[in-house]
């Protein structure tokens, strides 16, 4: 699906810009252009949320109350309505969306809002074999104050498929990019891990990429068949705080995680 795969970048005061995938994932292991750090603080705050195409009331108030202080907001099923684009460009330096499919008015897909401009951007799409709808993912990279580069993966995994072949296939290009990246990584989103086989495939991928799972003490994540759908994985960072916000503003609850950029605890 490469020819139809692109990201749209929204920046305040500028026309939307189309970003195509890089020619080679190997470029991520080479010198990337310099940029401003994602955070000047000791902490990196992220919000991860399947926003349900903004179909329910109060989604904007949740973003205003909990998203505006985050350095990164990773949305799934984000529809580029004027209200969401306005919030994104008013509170973040960049907002990158990968349209999974185009609805009658506004495209829907993963969208990453960031407090700094990414120095690398790679949109990805995978088509669901049964419904023929696409799910999207986005890989971006941001400088950190300690000169390291943080890779951020925002993913909405395929939902309707027989077996886990397509599910695992969607993770392959993400794994290729993580493998070429030597710095810290955050991989988060709606993984649709509603079966034991999907969960096993996801955990196997995380182990192969040396990623840890963020644990939530009061775990109010959305579940299907008793299994959580939303996850945050990481490496090269420490988790300072992690919580789940209970809300009716979507069919998923937002995940709030605060990282410290130091070397991870053993």
UniProtKB/Swiss-Prot annotation:
InterPro entries linked to this entry: Endo/exonu/phosph_ase_sf (IPR036691), Endo/exonuclease/phosphatase (IPR005135), UPF0294 (IPR022958)
Subcellular localization = Cytoplasm
Q: What is its main location?
A: cytoplasm
Q: Which GO terms describe its cellular component?
A: cytoplasm
Q: Name one GO molecular function term.
A: catalytic activity
Gene3D superfamilies associated with the record: Endonuclease/exonuclease/phosphatase (3.60.10.10)
**Domain of life of the organism encoding this protein:** Bacteria
**Keyword annotations:** Cytoplasm
The UniProt entry, under HAMAP family, shows: UPF0294 (MF_01119)
The UniProt similarity line reads: Belongs to the UPF0294 family.
Designated name of the protein: UPF0294 protein YafD
